[in-house]
A protein has these predicted regions:
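Flexible hinge/switch segments at interdomain interfaces of large molecular machines
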Residues: 9-15, 50-58, 90-100, 164-176
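RNA pseudouridine synthases
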Residues: 54-68, 73-102
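Translation machinery proteins
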Residues: 10-67
Length: 211
């Protein structure tokens, strides 16, 4: 969807650039990335739209589902069926979205950067939260940056001007409050999450169940 919105040139499409960076980080072959871009800009993809669904899983867990679809009727039916089969309920627009903050995030190598000094520098570019995190997979000390969704492009450009390599970046909907459940109830919610994630139109699923 990011290709359709802003074009297939990663230099002018920061969201696409992030997708390519993340694909490389996951060791996805370059040919696969290029095919995905070509597929997204083809005529067949011209009618795809982003649609967000909101609802509740069992035990009052809020669910937010991001989809990309060329047939809204099909996607609505499939998502509704997922909720119904798992004792959940599909809600109306705005019923749970207010429970989540739409954020963007970036991961960079820490190197010899002083965390506090770097945080002050990045606040001017819209960053709200900065913290150190050890990447076990890469055996690397990293810095995570979080900001509002709308600041993604500004922060990408700021990091590039500083010649800072972005290891990965993306978007999240972070619940403002989490709800704790016992193990049995968690399993019931997980069944719905898994069913939704298996649908080919679903891009991401967010919830407020405590881990």
């Amino acid at each position: 969807m990011c290709v359709k919105e802003s074009g297939p040139n990663p230099e002018s499409n920061s969201r696409l650039k992030a997708l390519i960076q993340n694909s490389r980080d996951a060791n996805m072959p370059k040919d696969n990335v290029e095919r995905a871009i070509k597929r997204a800009t083809s005529k067949d993809q011209a009618d795809y739209k982003e649609v967000i669904f909101e609802g509740y899983a069992p035990h009052g867990i809020a669910i937010l589902v991001e989809t990309a679809t060329d047939n809204n009727t099909r996607t609505v039916a499939n998502v509704r069926a997922c909720f119904n089969k798992c004792d959940g309920s599909l809600g109306t627009s705005g019923s749970v979205e207010f429970m989540f903050e739409h954020k963007c995030h970036f991961k960079i190598a820490q190197g010899d950067r002083d965390l506090e000094t770097f945080e002050f520098e990045m606040i001017d570019h819209g960053v709200e939260e900065v913290f150190a995190e050890y990447d076990e997979e890469k055996s690397l000390d990293t810095i995570m940056l979080y900001a509002q969704f709308a600041e993604f492009g500004n922060i990408t450009k700021a990091l590039e001007k500083m010649d800072i390599e972005i290891l990965s970046s993306g978007f999240e909907r972070i619940p403002m409050d989490n709800k704790s459940l016992d193990a049995i109830a968690q399993d019931e919610v997980e069944k719905l999450l898994e069913r939704l994630e298996e649908d080919e139109d679903v891009q991401a699923v967010f919830h407020n169940m405590a881990s």
